[in-house]
Amino acid sequence: RDAQESRGLGDVYKRQLKYSIYPESLTVSSPDDSLDSQEKFEIGTIDLSQLTTKYLQKLTLPIALPEGYKNISGNTSAMVSFEDAENYTFLSYTVQKDNIRIINAPDNFDVDVLTNELSVNVTGPADEIAALASKDIYATIDLMGTTLTAGLKDVTAEFTLRGTKVRSWMTGEYKVSIQVTERAEDTAN
């Protein structure tokens, strides 16, 4: 039996960034009744760290369905448009060493941040970006699950912007240099 139903295209990563998707829905068929249990199809994820003002105007995501499903509508891609995109901009800021912290370092290692400052790009509403200062940007290096050996290592930093209703985000991937030193074992009895 050919089940056929019209479904919404699903949510693309949505924080406080308003968007619309075209087409809003697809007609999909499946060879069995599995459509009855499908609430939505995810068509993709938008990585905000790669979303610059250039792509805020229009972004295209390919439409791929699970094996066995057929796209009756025929649309091969979805266009994502962001509301107020013309009011978004980006600026560069310098994050100081005091705003870079390490978490989840293994007990048998000492880890020190060597990077004194890091130049980063922030994308967001122009008024919010203009009010942002370097001291409002924090970098965190989470070493959970990272295999460490003594020496110099470049690790990816995750960023947080101070504020409760921040609609801005970091654009790009940033590495911080750390020095890893193995702690001497305590041999005292």
Question: Residue ranges of each PLM-predicted region?
Answer:
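Structured interface patches
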Residues: 1, 6-189
